[in-house]
Structures are given as C-alpha cells and as structure tokens.
Amino acid sequence: MKVNISIFGFGTVGRALAEIIAEKSRIFGVELNVISITDRSGTIWGDFDLLEAKEVKESTGKLSNIGDYEVYNFSPQELVEEVKPNILVDVSSWDEAHEMYKVALGEGISVVTSNKPPIANYYDELMNLAKENNAGIFFESTVMAGTPIIGVLRENLLGENIKRIDAVVNASTTFILTKMSEGKTLDDAIEEAKSLGILEEDPSKDIDGIDAYYKAKILHWVSYGEPPEEEERLGIREVRDARNVRLVAQVSKGKISVKPRKLSSDNPLLVEGVQNAAVIRTNNLGEVILKGPGGGGRVTASGVFTDIIKATLKFPNLR
C-alpha cells in the first residue's frame, strides 16, 4: 500500500529525511511516496526524483531550480488543501506552523513534526483536533532529536506518575559550555559552533535558553496533560566558570525551569559534545535515564522517519 507524504521545509533535516526515505521507501508492507516538497522558493508536486531534489537544493540552495517540474507558490494552507497528502511532515522552523497543522488535522491528515513552537504553544488544541478527526500528531524529534524521550513518556511510562524530569536537551549549549570549560570565551565558542553548523538559525534561541524552554514545555504537556503554571528561563550568557555546568531543563507538575546548573562529576546529565540526556523520576521504576545524540540532520531525521512509520501503523486509514 502507498502512503503519500508532503515534506514542508528542505533544510538539513528535510534533506536527511529525503535520503532516509529513499533508502527505506518500502517498510512494513508500506510504500512511502513523497509527492511534494516545499522550501522558501516554492513547492514541487508530482512524480519527481527525491534524490535529484536533494542534490538540486544542496548545489543551488533553491528547490525551484529543479529542471523539468512545475514549481507552485502555494501558501502553507493551500499546500494542504491542494496536494492532500496522507501525512504532512513539517521539518521547518516556522513558528506559526500550527495554522497549517490545523488545516491538515481538520482534513483528517496526520502531522509529523520536528518543529517545537507549534507543539509547545498549541499542544492541547492540536491534540483535540487530531482526536476529533481520527488523525494523529507525532513530534518525537522536537525533544532530544532522535533519542525517543517522547515515545517513552507517551507509550512506555503510561502507568507511571512522573515526579520530575531533569534533562539536558540543547546540544548547542552543551558544546559551547564544553568549549568554555576548555578555556575558550563564550564568543569564540559560539563562532566555532556556528562554523560546525551546530547552532540554530538564530543563535539567541540556544544561548538564551529559548530552545530548551520550548522542549521543557513540551515535556510538561506530555507528562501532565496541561501547561505549566510557573516558568523560569535563564540562558548561559552570564556563565563565567563553565566547568561541569550544563543548561538543565527541570520539569515537575505545574512548573518548568531552564537554567545553568553546576553538576557533580558522576551526574548522568554531565554529557559532552552534542549529547543530550534526561533523568525521568517515576513512582514505581525510580530513575529512568536516557542518553543519545541531541542534534544533527540525520539524527533528527531518524526520529521524524520513525514517527512517519508510527503514523502509518497507527492509522490504517492512511493506507
């Protein structure tokens, strides 16, 4: 059976996802068929070569430079209404993408996303809309990239009371703090992170804790089914001694906090490089510890791809 997919956003993650789909287009008896791709230059829609699209984007910077295919200038809402995919995949950084999700879910189209603000800010509305229209919304890669903390909370710990989550969920600040502990200044560490493509498009989202805040808010929604009442956010700009310091997101019922914390040398959150880690404290299991890579195109795309498979298996009507 064939599942038609629209990819919205064709940056590093989108292109890595295209590569994975090309490698594994037939899986669990399902054929994954990408029928449209959208970047800032427009939308290609129809029977095109996925890897050719990837190569054109990488070599020219614009999907619209692809050869023999018509390029459409759809609005995000028009994209959903005209293309009518079975699954809409958002791997963009568009903060207002929830409006597109609402159109898709209202049409019974499942949504897979790695985009944090729409889930953090509109979780309840989107989940209810999905339920009303027998669709799904999947967002594993919004937190810890491909390391499956969302799946663990939504599926594997359903019988547990989540007492607290402590997590290092921003790989960029971990990299920067690691470099600062080796003697680099904040500015020099930021420049090195930029040169390696580790930082977000707007570095302030990482440095000021905004990215980690969105992730903490998503973890609160998933763990407790409601928004936090208390919020605290402090970035890493004021850190002077970075030795054993990490930007830690702490989530408990009604409260989220994101701020730098000095950790003991045996703390599982004291990860290096671009690693992420989380300690989930539960009533029966005690501490559940997750560690894994927290960024990178292929790593994030892996989580997105897993969500695409989950969507096809959970909603047979897609096929």
UniProtKB/Swiss-Prot annotation:
Disulfide-bond pairs as recorded: none
Keyword Transmembrane helix: no
NCBIfam families: PRK08374.1 (NF006235)
Catalytic activity: L-homoserine + NAD(+) = L-aspartate 4-semialdehyde + NADH + H(+)
Binding partners and assembly: Homodimer.
One GO term of the biological process aspect: threonine biosynthetic process
Full protein name: Homoserine dehydrogenase
Active site residues according to the UniProt entry: K215
Source species, domain of life: Archaea
Known function: Catalyzes the conversion of L-aspartate-beta-semialdehyde (L-Asa) to L-homoserine (L-Hse), the third step in the biosynthesis of threonine and methionine from aspartate. Utilizes NADH but not NADPH as coenzyme.
Organism encoding this protein: Pyrococcus horikoshii (strain ATCC 700860 / DSM 12428 / JCM 9974 / NBRC 100139 / OT-3)
EC primary class: oxidoreductase
Pfam families, alphabetized: Homoserine_dh, NAD_binding_3
Residues that coordinate or bind L-homoserine: E200, D211
Family: Belongs to the homoserine dehydrogenase family.
Cofactor: a metal cation
UniProt KW keywords: Amino-acid biosynthesis, Metal-binding, Methionine biosynthesis, NAD, NADP, Nucleotide-binding, Oxidoreductase, Sodium, Threonine biosynthesis
Taxonomic lineage from the root: Archaea, Methanobacteriati, Methanobacteriota, Thermococci, Thermococcales
